[in-house]
Amino acid sequence: MLVPQTLHRLLGLGHQQRPRYHAKQPLPYDVVVVDEASMLDLQLATLLFEAIPANCRLILLGDAKQLASVDVGAVLADLQQVPALKHNHVQLVTSRRFNAEAKIGQFAGFIQHLSDVKPAEDILAAFEQQVASAQTLQSIQLHDNMSDLVQLEYLNDSLLHEPTAYYLQLMQGYVPYVNALKQYREQAASIDLAKVIQAFDDYRILVAIRFGKFGLDQINRFAEDWLTTQLMVVPVAGWYLGRPVMMTYNDYQLGLSNGDIGICFRHRTQSDQFEVYFPSLDKWVAANRLPKNIQTAFALTIHKSQGSEFKHTAIVFDASAEKILSQELIYTAITRAKNIVSLLVDRAAFLQSLTQRTARKSGLVKKLIMISF
């Protein structure tokens, strides 16, 4: 069975950033497939290309309309602009995730076909009329009979001084997760752990920025207090049943990579200890071996959510996020969802996210065109 791995693992990049595989010692494969290739930065792409042997086929899968890497370069988008590579470029025009009539599909298509010449207010009006169910998000809990929905609520300026009501709205998506944790705690021996994992993975809060009232840190703090109150537990050295965490760097000793997400449970053999299960790796790690500053992950930044998929995403940002908002950011956020998108946003900031595009110039296109002639 093929086991997926990060590019860092594939190339053998360790602490010294000296890859095990390179031009003089290439990868021992006939085919290498890279998913979510829009996230490739220039440096990592260079290391990858150098390690590909002459008889190996490299396949890059990705959506150039999504966010590029946080580091230098937009490699996938640049490669698509090189005339010499036009016959190597194939574009999927029929979505296999959701059909063209689905609300999320309409939302994604709406962003893809935005015209720069259309007045901004007309764009927003068209979105409100054609795509969104413009209503108060009285409950954003995932229901089985709500399999195709885009919800929209604009933040009320008069309520922003005390946003607790908004936080509680966002927490409703985690009610099934709380219920699954309660059941697990009461019947751990007979409950399938996969059901708890799935209850968590069904829903995620996505934010644009780290700081501020609707930033990553504040929402995760509120979610932590909310969950521990619901479960009536007291954290021990920061750990508690159900705490979701995400690695923010590669730890080669633990075998964990940047972006790996795990959930905290009571230790299977030592009831006074905690351990964290990482589903994507099918791996348990003692909580006390993980870094003390590991990130709680009820909410993720949109950048960090790339490559993930959830039944329901709640996207939240206020005016303080305006500087980084773009079509690519909002497009990436909505395409993380399979069924439901709930937007809880500042109106002016949302308008900016629909009308502003990110422009990057790494010089890669120019260089590739020069060497292809």
Describe the residue ranges of each PLM region:
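Inter-Walker segment of RecA-like/P-loop motor cores
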Residues: 1-28, 300
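Catalytic acidic motif of RecA-like/P-loop NTPases
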Residues: 8, 38-39, 46, 65-66
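Short basic/glycine-enriched coil/helix segment immediately N-terminal to the Walker B
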Residues: 16-30, 40-56, 200
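Short glycine-/polar-rich loops that comprise or flank the Walker A/P-loop
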Residues: 29, 54-57, 85-90, 201, ...
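Walker B catalytic acidic pair
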Residues: 35-36, 62
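Residue-level recognition of short, solvent-exposed, well-ordered loop/turn junctions
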Residues: 53, 238-241, 257, 305, ...
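Conserved helicase motor core of P-loop NTPases
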Residues: 65, 69-245, 251-253
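C-terminal accessory regions
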Residues: 260-373
